[in-house]
């Protein structure tokens, strides 16, 4: 699909469709007013008859509007003008795109990017429109024997900006939005893949393919034999019950002018299926445990977006691939594991396995002498209880890094919120037999999980993103969300000095 920006009057647009907004109650947006004037009040007369109230997401497709060069005009309900916020704006864009796609408008000029969204500029509106468009048109149907086809799908979308001086900003927003959308799609595709296909070896194959596609990327795969030599006993223990070999994929992107500049390291939990192991999960909903690798999928998607943007920064992405299954060789509650760092862990629950994989991955990345490390993981159900399905949890040992990530989440509208990590929570991890236990009980489960990880991240600035509530959706809209790719790319845009705000 082709995107572009322009600055022009609606009456001069010769397109299959023009998209303009209508506010409640039946009040035309400034652009719609221009079309109404040209058409001698044709549009306002329809509104007076009650054809469109202007409620959020309402659509009215008009044909052959008098005086308008475009074949069609799509009126889009935008709700009350003063209440138009970020979420509503993105939902309106998605509904608009779906309507255009379903009604055979193969190209359109969209004036919704001229609407006033509280606290947001043209760059944000255009970029979010691109991301929302791609998100709304996303499908995962490769395993369906009969694939649905759109007869005349939307192929070209032009976003109008208020002034010509904003054209460069709009073009930058499209470039960024397309790269991020590409990363989000890659993340979704990996997450939605069935676990009989998307095992650790599949993750590794995708990492290799990324290196084949981009000159700035190199990939290294670490299998169980090398992990054994490295002393990654905790990581290896989790995968012992599965016939699928554990594999850690190291994706290195070098874009900084100084190739020796310290890298930012992203570590993704890649449990391609988590049965819970010996501490078996309930059967209901267990199919969704294929999404336990969404941390790794989001790191993969971020690396892809990064390569597309060719940002001047060095980044290393780690996909910690593993499968947690019960079996005669599976690790057990009561086992004591010696981690790569030399610290010992008493296993009280084999379903708290993500931290046992991540702790060795966090120790491994010390060798890169990182500028900072951010791990991403569907780690705790407690985070879903604390923050629901809308906001990602952030925990960190470094205040400036935590602030950077939360700020990036605000800029990208991929929301995150910082949770505390006080010393008192470490008390819950004490073990009478080892240096620590792998769980700390029900109270503050997200925090104690982060406290566990922090014991392996003392040699660098570190942050942990718990995406257990935000990585996928259940129910009718079941599927990977592609989060937090947008937030991570924004973080890297900021780190590389890219200006994304007016």
Swiss-Prot record:
Catalytic machinery residues: 281, 355
Pfam families assigned to the protein according to its UniProt record, in alphabetical order: Peptidase_M17 (PF00883), Peptidase_M17_N (PF02789)
EC number(s) recorded for this UniProt protein: 3.4.11.1, 3.4.11.10
Cofactor note: Binds 2 manganese ions per subunit.
Protein name in the entry: Probable cytosol aminopeptidase
Gene Ontology molecular function: any one: metalloaminopeptidase activity
GO cellular component terms listed in the entry, alphabetical order: cytoplasm
């Amino acid at each position: 699909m082709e995107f572009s920006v322009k600055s022009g009057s609606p009456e001069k647009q010769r397109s299959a469709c023009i998209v303009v907004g209508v506010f409640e109650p039946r009040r035309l947006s400034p652009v719609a007013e221009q079309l109404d004037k040209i058409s001698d009040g044709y549009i306002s007369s329809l509104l007076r008859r009650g054809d469109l109230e202007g409620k959020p997401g309402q659509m009215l497709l008009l044909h052959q509007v008098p005086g308008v060069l475009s074949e069609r005009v799509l009126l889009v309900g935008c709700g009350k003008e003063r209440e138009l916020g970020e979420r509503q704006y993105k939902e309106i864009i998605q509904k608009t795109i779906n309507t255009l796609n379903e009604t055979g408008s193969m190209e359109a000029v969209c004036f919704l990017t001229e609407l006033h969204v509280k606290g947001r500029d043209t760059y944000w509106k255009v970029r979010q429109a691109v991301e929302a468009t791609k998100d709304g048109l996303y499908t995962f149907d490769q395993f369906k024997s009969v694939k649905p086809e759109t007869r005349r799908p939307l192929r070209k979308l032009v976003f109008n900006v208020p002034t010509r001086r904003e054209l460069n900003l709009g073009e930058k927003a499209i470039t960024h939005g397309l790269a991020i959308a590409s990363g989000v799609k890659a993340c979704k595709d990996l997450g939605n893949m069935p676990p009989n296909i998307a095992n650790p070896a599949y993750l590794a194959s995708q990492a290799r393919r990324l290196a084949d596609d981009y000159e700035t990327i190199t990939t290294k795969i670490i299998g169980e034999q090398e992990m054994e030599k490295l002393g990654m006993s905790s990581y290896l223990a989790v995968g012992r019950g599965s016939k699928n070999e554990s594999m850690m994929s190291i994706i290195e992107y070098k874009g900084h002018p100084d190739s020796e500049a310290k890298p930012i390291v992203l570590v993704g939990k890649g449990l391609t299926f988590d049965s819970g192991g010996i501490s078996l999960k309930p059967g209901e909903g267990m199919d969704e445990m294929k999404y336990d690798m969404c941390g790794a999928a989001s790191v993969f998607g971020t690396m892809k977006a990064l390569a597309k943007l060719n940002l001047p920064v060095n980044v290393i992405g780690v996909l910690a691939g593993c499968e947690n299954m019960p079996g005669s060789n599976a690790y057990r509650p009561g086992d004591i594991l010696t981690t790569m760092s030399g610290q010992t862990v008493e296993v009280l629950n084999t379903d708290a396995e993500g931290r046992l994989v991540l702790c060795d991955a966090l120790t491994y990345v010390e060798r890169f002498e990182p500028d900072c490390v951010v791990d991403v993981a569907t780690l705790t159900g407690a985070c879903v209880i604390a923050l629901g399905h809308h906001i990602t949890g952030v925990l960190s040992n470094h205040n400036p890094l935590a602030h950077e990530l939360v700020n990036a989440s605000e800029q990208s509208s991929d929301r995150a919120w910082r949770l505390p990590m006080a010393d008192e929570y470490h008390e819950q991890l004490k073990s009478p037999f080892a240096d620590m236990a792998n769980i700390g009980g029900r109270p503050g489960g997200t925090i104690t999980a982060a406290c566990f990880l922090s014991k392996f991240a003392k040699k660098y600035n570190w942050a942990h993103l718990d995406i257990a509530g935000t990585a996928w959706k259940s129910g009718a809209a079941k599927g990977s969300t592609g989060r937090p790719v947008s937030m991570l790319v924004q973080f890297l845009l900021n780190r590389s000095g890219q200006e994304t705000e007016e």
